[in-house]
Amino acid sequence: MTEPYVRDFQAFASNGAAGAPPWLREIREGAIARFTALGFPTMKQEAWRFTSVAPIAETHFTLPGSRRPQLALRDVAALSALGAGPRLVFVDGRYEPGLSSLAGLPEGVQATSLAEATRSGPRGELARRHLARYAPWQDSAFAALNTAFLADGAFVHVAADTVLAQPLEVLFLATSGTAVTGAGGPTVSHPRSLFIVERGARATLIESYASIADGLQWTNAVTETVVGEGARVELYRVQREGRNAYHIATTQSRQERDSYLGLHVLTLGGSLARHDITTVLDGTGAELILNGLYVLGGSQHADHHTVIDHARPHCASHEFFNGVLAERAHGVFNGRIIVRPGAQRTDSKQTNNNLLLSTEARADSQPQLEIYADDVKCTHGSTVGPLDQTALYYLRSRGLSPETAQSLVTYGFAAEILGRMQRPDVRERLDRLVRAGLA
């Protein structure tokens, strides 16, 4: 099942990617070798026992051709998670400067394509220092495949003590083979993002994924984020691709001393979605807030695997994930907190709650703690259940219809996560997306 992608890589390496610097070509070669050795994961592996990727493994998804869909700025605004503001736009993983808008970014913020950033100069050195250093492509077949086909993506660098006051969006749009571009079958894109926020800087970044059409397509994304000493970052990730889309993602973050990362994950789209999220608190005093919400219906399947690695003492992490599952949807959550030897005075909390709106909906929740230090405060828990009948009765007794009462209770459950998101302007926009997903 890996052979077609090895052949595609050989063509990619000799044609479209031939102009890459030697260090990047070396990484790609190593990544395709690891993908070949690892193969696609199966349900026999513990980390994948609730999620089958057979629909991906048994289909040959090809790279999109050179033909591009015709999009206008108003189309992009409609597909954006924010609607307005500075943004980098990518179609099938390739940068589209004509659809992007970077006006108003302060001095000290560089936002461009990875293809441009890796070529030369200070940006090239930054990319070389960080790119493919954090995402686990040696151990993950999907991260390895993304790294092998690494040609373009988003590069955002916020210099030390710089304040990026307004949110910067990185928008990845996926086509769907024949439905949009005339390509001869289902296509795959490998979006890549590298976010570097230096010492003492402040930034809000939104990474959003949407489909241009509803045909069969696969997005295989990798994001690496570095949060420097004393920096503060709010990173929102919004996935609302089409119902015939497969979405596999790896999000890897590294935090330095006294840094803060608020990572907010919203999963609404895709037929099959898997998101591996790992954050390493690698400096004393680092703080992580990880919020997640998945709203699923039909036969959607979404699997979130999170790892919070407390590698240094006096760090804090608070993780809250809620899932709303209707019809035959299946939600999977696996949350792992690791407290390394010597990481004393760790403060960590993890909660996963799932709301089942039908008897056919299903949720599997596995919170885990691995503690190798003795002076820590760590808790975890999960719930799976139907609507709160007491709350429904209360609303019905005040004259609300059964449908309205259910809608209010369901929205209130989702709003628990939305309310934890820091920026009111972003929260308001995401609230609209969630309400539409619940309708």
Where are these regions (language model features)?
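Generic hydrophobic-segment detector
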Residues: 21, 29, 34-37, 83, ...
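Conserved beta-strand/loop scaffold segments within soluble protein domains that form the structured core
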Residues: 122-400, 414-439
